[in-house]
């Protein structure tokens, strides 16, 4: 009866500390060598049942100071209750292990909630504006569509934002670099100037309404020189070489036509001479082939035997003149 009263008072003293201490003491209680009596075992099992204890409510965002300092009293309480339950043989290392299992840090719930609340109030990340990409019509994180840039002929954008103008030469189809520009319109004007120099009025221009005067382009904005002087000089040299090759092609074609015209009168004169000779002589001139075939025809040289004449056999013909090693002619003729 006294043991039961001691266990009851011990259980009342442990209710304030919670059920975590008893969960940590369960494996050590089972390994105790001294087995208690039946009455003390029944009371101990009733004492260790988890329904006999009620966990204190965990503090919210602002924990109480008494709750934080409460686990430090478990070491002194453990030595007092060890004699009641039968844990006198626990070593100091085991006691420290139990204390380390009990002293868990509190979950930082208020810190996480504050972080989530600050994430809701923080601005959304936005991508940088990409003006050269035609497909990026919408910016990331914004519902307002961005204005797509116009694409020009012979113009492309570098990945760092600059614009480059290039043109293909009509002869060998190679690309000629025209320069790097800050805007797409400047690069398009440079392409128009180069295309007009190479192809003239047949060029396809980005701005066909502008007028081209030498190396300048005129419009409502005034006179503008889009190409660099070195690029302009290179274009002039290319245009001169193209003009020279065109002149050479035209000269070769005209010379071929003249050769055809010179050769055609000679043939006509030969035909006319032959016609005149036929009309004067009355008969065409005899060729060498006709002269060779006129003397004798190939049919006159052929001779055929008369089928009515009997064949002439030689009666003195004997087979002995033609001996053979396989046939015995003496036995045959005997």
Swiss-Prot record:
The organism named in the record is Arabidopsis thaliana
Subcellular location, in the record's words?
Nucleus
Name used for this protein in its record: Ethylene-responsive transcription factor RAP2-4
Q: List the disulfide bonds.
A: none
Entry keyword set: Activator, DNA-binding, Ethylene signaling pathway, Nucleus, Transcription, Transcription regulation
Q: Which GO terms describe its cellular component?
A: nucleus
Give the UniProt record's GO annotations in the biological process aspect. cellular response to salt stress; cytokinin-activated signaling pathway; ethylene-activated signaling pathway; regulation of cell differentiation; response to cold; response to heat; response to light stimulus; response to osmotic stress
Q: Where DNA binds (residue ranges)? A: 151-208
State what this protein does.
Probably acts as a transcriptional activator. Binds to the GCC-box pathogenesis-related promoter element. May be involved in the regulation of gene expression by stress factors and by components of stress signal transduction pathways.
